[in-house]
């Protein structure tokens, strides 16, 4: 038996937008992220808007490309992870770098899957089948969350993320 392992392969600088064309912005003061109305002209480097999507090779075949996300804010690097809090899985950002090699399960890996085009995707959390990155309204923006879908082929616009 071979355990799951991930080896960092490459990364790309990207912007993540939801179905409403809002841009994902990470706020280090709250260690979370949300989708906000930001125009292309308002995007600034190292302000939590420009993410890196890290691709990993895996020893186990999977449905979707294993990826992790990181972002730089004020010369500090943060990586996206998922943690349980009060019985609910939440998306967090922690200071540090994504690892080059991961042996076993990891709370930073998501499986990138096509949503309905080559630029729109959904990202399934690697540790819980059927849990996807999504957004929900919270105050003036839409907070990045993990959302359980009842069926894998369910079309849910809140899980659609454009790169």
Where are these regions (language model features)?
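Lectin-like carbohydrate-binding module/patch detector with strong preference for beta-trefoil
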Residues: 1-163
């Amino acid at each position: 038996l071979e355990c799951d392992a991930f080896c960092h392969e490459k990364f790309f600088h990207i912007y993540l937008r939801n179905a409403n064309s809002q841009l994902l912005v990470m706020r280090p003061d709250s260690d979370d992220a949300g989708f906000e109305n930001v125009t292309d002209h308002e995007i600034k480097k190292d302000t939590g808007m420009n993410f890196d999507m890290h691709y990993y090779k895996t020893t186990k075949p999977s449905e979707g490309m294993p990826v992790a996300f990181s972002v730089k804010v004020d010369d500090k690097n943060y990586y996206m992870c998922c943690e349980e809090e009060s019985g609910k899985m939440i998306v967090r950002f922690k200071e540090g770098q994504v690892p080059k090699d991961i042996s076993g399960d990891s709370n930073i890996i998501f499986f990138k899957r096509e949503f309905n085009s080559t630029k729109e995707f959904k990202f399934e959390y690697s540790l819980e089948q059927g849990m996807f990155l999504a957004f929900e309204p919270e105050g003036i923006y839409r907070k990045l969350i993990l959302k359980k879908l009842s069926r894998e082929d369910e079309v849910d616009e809140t899980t659609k993320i454009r790169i």
